[in-house]
């Protein structure tokens, strides 16, 4: 991973356009090819980013060089580097990834087997659908064929909603999947998390773990 602290301006050019005026920012260039731009006031969420596969090149600008990050669809993240204050590279090795606790892993398995709990006509596309920022628990399609990303938690809190929001922002950049809606599924969801999810257009679903454990893999068991 390469970490660069620089005075820079940033322009996103693609289906949408966005401009960040000159400021000191952290630029992260990861080994998977992704590039993200961070400020000091947004926790872990980048100001803008480009997901892999993409290519980073440098153009000679006047008066400053321009880093051009381009993805396979031709969208560009153009970073005009006015001054570099820090530039270092680090080999972090292979990360083992986030390991879900036993209950969350079992909830994911059960919901994948009984995807109809999400709604009539839902079908499973894939469990652990990989993205540049981690795996989405379930990627499904609703009764109309539209993509739905499902994040599963034992306890639904604000950080889980934020995590799903990041997945949705990324998935909706994929023209083969967009539009992608979200479902936040948990055994219990805190009021603040539900409010945030509703505000972002994410549907909340309460999972009854005991009932789901009483289901066979191919039919409901009544008890």
Curated annotation (Swiss-Prot):
<dbReference type="GO" id="GO:0005737">
    <property type="term" value="C:cytoplasm"/>
</dbReference>
<keyword id="KW-0963">Cytoplasm</keyword>
<comment type="function">
    <text>Cleaves both 3' and 5' ssDNA extremities of branched DNA structures.</text>
</comment>
<keyword id="KW-0255">Endonuclease</keyword>
<keyword id="KW-0378">Hydrolase</keyword>
<dbReference type="InterPro" id="IPR011856">
    <property type="entry name" value="tRNA_endonuc-like_dom_sf"/>
</dbReference>
<comment type="similarity">
    <text>Belongs to the NucS endonuclease family.</text>
</comment>
<dbReference type="InterPro" id="IPR048302">
    <property type="entry name" value="NucS_N"/>
</dbReference>
<dbReference type="Pfam" id="PF21003">
    <property type="entry name" value="NucS_N"/>
</dbReference>
<dbReference type="Pfam" id="PF01939">
    <property type="entry name" value="NucS_C"/>
</dbReference>
<dbReference type="GO" id="GO:0003677">
    <property type="term" value="F:DNA binding"/>
</dbReference>
<protein>
    <recommendedName>
        <fullName>Endonuclease NucS</fullName>
        <ecNumber>3.1.-.-</ecNumber>
    </recommendedName>
</protein>
<dbReference type="InterPro" id="IPR049173">
    <property type="entry name" value="NucS_N_sf"/>
</dbReference>
<dbReference type="InterPro" id="IPR048301">
    <property type="entry name" value="NucS_C"/>
</dbReference>
<dbReference type="InterPro" id="IPR002793">
    <property type="entry name" value="Endonuclease_NucS"/>
</dbReference>
<keyword id="KW-0540">Nuclease</keyword>
<keyword id="KW-0238">DNA-binding</keyword>
<dbReference type="GO" id="GO:0000014">
    <property type="term" value="F:single-stranded DNA endodeoxyribonuclease activity"/>
</dbReference>
């Amino acid at each position: 991973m390469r970490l660069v602290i620089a005075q820079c301006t940033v322009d996103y050019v693609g289906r949408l356009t966005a401009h960040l005026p000159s400021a000191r920012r952290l630029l992260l260039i990861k080994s998977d090819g992704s590039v993200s731009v961070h400020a000091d006031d947004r926790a872990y969420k980048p100001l803008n980013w480009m997901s892999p596969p993409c290519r980073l090149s440098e153009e000679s600008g006047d008066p400053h060089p321009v880093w051009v990050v381009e993805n396979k669809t031709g969208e560009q993240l153009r970073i005009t580097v006015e001054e570099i204050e820090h530039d270092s590279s680090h080999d972090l090795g292979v990360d083992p990834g986030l390991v879900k606790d036993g209950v969350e892993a079992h909830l994911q398995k059960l919901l994948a087997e009984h995807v109809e709990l999400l709604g009539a006509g839902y079908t499973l596309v894939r469990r652990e659908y990989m993205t540049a920022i981690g795996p989405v628990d379930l990627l499904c399609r609703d009764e109309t064929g539209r993509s739905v990303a499902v994040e599963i938690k034992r306890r639904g809190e604000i950080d889980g909603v934020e995590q799903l929001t990041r997945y949705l922002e990324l998935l909706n950049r994929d023209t083969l999947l967009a539009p992608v809606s979200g479902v936040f599924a948990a055994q219990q969801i805190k009021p603040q998390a539900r409010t945030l999810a509703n505000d972002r257009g994410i549907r909340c679903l309460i999972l009854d773990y005991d009932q789901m454990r009483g289901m066979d893999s191919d039919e409901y068991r009544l008890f």
